[in-house]
Curated annotation (Swiss-Prot):
One of its GO terms (cellular component) is plasma membrane. Signal peptide: none annotated. Residues 5-87 form the PTS EIIB type-1 domain. It is found in: Cell membrane. Keywords: Cell membrane, Kinase, Membrane, Phosphotransferase system, Sugar transport, Transferase, Transmembrane, Transmembrane helix, Transport. It is an enzyme of class 2 (transferase). Pathway: Cell wall biogenesis; peptidoglycan recycling. It is a multi-pass membrane protein. This is PTS system MurNAc-GlcNAc-specific EIIBC component. The keyword Plastid does not apply. It comes from the Bacteria.
Amino acid sequence: MTKEQQLAERIIAAVGGMDNIDSVMNCMTRVRIKVLDENKVDDQELRHIDGVMGVIHDERIQVVVGPGTVNKVANHMAELSGVKLGDPIPHNHNDSEKMDYKSYAADKAKANKEAHKAKQKNGKLNKVLKSIANIFIPLIPAFIGAGLIGGIAAVLSNLMVAGYISGAWITQLITVFNVIKDGMLAYLAIFTGINAAKEFGATPGLGGVIGGTTLLTGIAGKNILMNVFTGEPLQPGQGGIIGVIFAVWILSIVEKRLHKIVPNAIDIIVTPTIALLIVGLLTIFIFMPLAGFVSDSLVSVVNGIISIGGVFSGFIIGASFLPLVMLGLHHIFTPIHIEMINQSGATYLLPIAAMAGAGQVGAALALWVRCKRNTTLRNTLKGALPVGFLGIGEPLIYGVTLPLGRPFLTACIGGGIGGAVIGGIGHIGAKAIGPSGVSLLPLISDNMYLGYIAGLLAAYAGGFVCTYLFGTTKAMRQTDLLGD
């Protein structure tokens, strides 16, 4: 049995066994477990499992185990459950000798009541933010892979222009790399539509069609569609993914209503046809123009804040981004990044936000130096620091800085310092969405590599100095504990 399989089975035991698990899924660093009864979860045992870097309680229990490991752990849990990742795990409650129906009903009612309270507590805004995260989390590997391949193509192009490399095969290679990159970015509206449909309860294929509708495929020359509000021609992709998400949300409402009123015998034919006609027309003539206005305004505001605020805006964004990652709300920026790239050719927000992770790396390096006697902490840092340099910060957040408290705050200050440098230099953007840290370098636009490196070094230094001077306690330096 591999260590990942052992970790998966220990996690299952700590959350109350397979009988207490409703479904399992994962993102880049977290195993996301939906349990039937929170009271059966042993939180302390879960947190102290070797390999678990942190635990977040939300609608799902999110167990941070780190990149790479998370896929193996989640897949093994799915194998043990007998279903695919994300699918509900069946539980046999038909045995009357083993089943106390009265207790089961009471427990179910209690669970539903707690879930309802949790939803009320979370509020509509948090629900919206989580929906956006659920739409884009499955796309993160594609963003990273396609973005880095596009970045490599850009670097090769720059080297050709500078005369360092040449040859027809290099040109062909660059073309192939760009085709692979565009396989993701050119059809992002379709991918977004499919995932949005899954999130809102619509048919995924119909969501993909609505996303594809915004691309205005086949519209060219005199055969154009007009913006009913401005009289100008509609542009392919106008309204961006913000328009797609809203349109698919409307699609989910229309489709559900149609399922209720259309007879079963013709439901499979009538419902998708009418749903696509209604929402397709609304998307082209209403949602695309309005969402286009919203997207343009949003990008203008963000660019204005970064441009006018400079050092100050950079510090605020860099310092506040780690708490957003901690809360899982950083995915709200994904639509903004994409719209900035579509309109400006680069997102000037991402390099500033990336400084948060660099500040945390600096803080972790200071802990490595200051806490030489704390072997538990240093062992955790051995696994979390390398991926931190590459822009994956959750293992450091949940495994190191957040449990210790002070280093989390000093890491935020380090991120703010790096963000201030990026904001002060200005015009440092990323051509695509990808990981932060050193891994973002190939994606930096307009050859502003040195400016980005300066920001990274400033964040490393700021996080290191602040943590070295103010981020540790005597207990951290002298004991073998990771936190209270």
